[in-house]
Amino acid sequence: EKHIIINADIDSDLIITGHEVSLRRAVTNLIDNAIKFTKSTINITAKRNNLYLIIEVTDNGIGIEPDNLSQIFNRMYQTEQSRNKKSNHGIGLGLYFVDKVVHLHHGTITAKSELGVFTTFSITLPLSEKLIE
């Protein structure tokens, strides 16, 4: 059993157009991964940046090897750390799914990490035209 602190900083009035269930599942996948790998703290932000919504999920967990960062969105790919995790390690489809959903919504996803310190996933999605006007 872990005791995890989750901090959320979410701007109000953020509207995007898209498939709600898929987008919700994509963000949930990132949060589930953060819970799985964090030592104690997860930070979630959703902020407006001009015409885009930027969602970031950061954990202070095991991190991702630099050589793996370019491959983590590939189908069925698992890092060595993930394969060695004793429980709930999945089959390597979660980040692949997130990547596909984000790109289908004309967005981008990136990951940055420092081994043993943190991992941050950033999703950038276009805001709804209703909000931009």
Each language-model region and where it sits:
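Short conserved segment of the HATPase_c
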Residues: 64-77
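Acidic ATP/Mg2+-coordinating residue in the GHKL
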Residues: 59
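Conserved catalytic submotifs in the C-terminal HATPase_c
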Residues: 5-14, 50
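Short alpha-helical Gxxx[C/S/T] motif in the catalytic ATP-binding
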Residues: 94, 98
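Glycine-rich nucleotide-binding loop
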Residues: 52, 63, 92, 115-122
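Short beta-strand/loop element within the Bergerat-fold HATPase_c
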Residues: 41-51
